[in-house]
């Protein structure tokens, strides 16, 4: 496996976790009445989710085994 693919594989879980974290922070900000911050955090969650989708696509196309993130990605998608 190419070194860059190994590095990308290591980022998949990070991106999904970041998406979930930003989504959670967005909800907290919304509950606190900080709507502007909530929207920015939600945008950040969406960006991280898109990064995860792109990473998964690259790894799948390259035939690289990677952690099964379908459950967490579904949770992240639901939170968006």
Predicted regions and their residues:
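Non-heme di-metal
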Residues: 1-80
